[in-house]
């Protein structure tokens, strides 16, 4: 909590159980002080400062922090930064895709090498018409990457580097700036239908331009704090990674 106000503690009793209520401004719009590893687009996620306050207050290093509705993983990532062991759970498969890889941050050079090794079939297309979202070359790169990742998983050869690339690519599929693979649209968790996208394109007078997916993956990997660890080994930056449980 970076607020200048002191936290107010109120106690409420419900069925003879005393419940503490903490009142304060736990983050403000000017605060960008959390770790950049949290910079993942996800609908209705809260700022890391909120779980940090309660994790510091209610637990000690090496304690277990359990999040039954993990979402993009804000709570468990923040808990691990505070040297807690964590258990993460969420019915949405996106939760694991977006959370797990951030416990095993790879070198930027390794990401480049892996991306360079992936063959791109220029004629590759999705099973459905996505021309209203992607330039043909961009779509070919996305489909080729998907084919590579699926083949690695099916062969039992998928590693943490593959999972990192999948995480970043998933988070960059659609959005509202040139930092995404698509033309201007909404992010994956607010995705519109192809018919709606056609209307958006017509209204804005836009058409999909080529986006270099590999360059975008590299750039966003850098934003997610790769630079801090570029000179270190590609092992986990968290002491708790060997005990990670994502169910």
Positions of predicted regions on the chain:
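Short, compositionally biased low-complexity segments
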Residues: 24-25, 113-122, 134-138, 183-205
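Hydrophobic residues within well-ordered, non-membrane alpha-helices that form the packing/core
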Residues: 55, 103, 146-149, 169
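Short, charged/polar micro-motifs that form catalytic or ligand-binding hotspots
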Residues: 37-41, 89, 132, 155
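Hydrophobic (often cysteine-bearing) scaffold residues that line and stabilize catalytic clefts
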Residues: 43, 47, 95, 138, ...
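PRPP-dependent phosphoribosyltransferase catalytic core
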Residues: 109-153
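S-adenosyl-L-methionine
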Residues: 1-61
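Conserved S-adenosyl-L-methionine
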Residues: 47-50, 54-123, 206-207, 211-247
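SAM-dependent nucleic-acid methyltransferase catalytic core
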Residues: 151-247
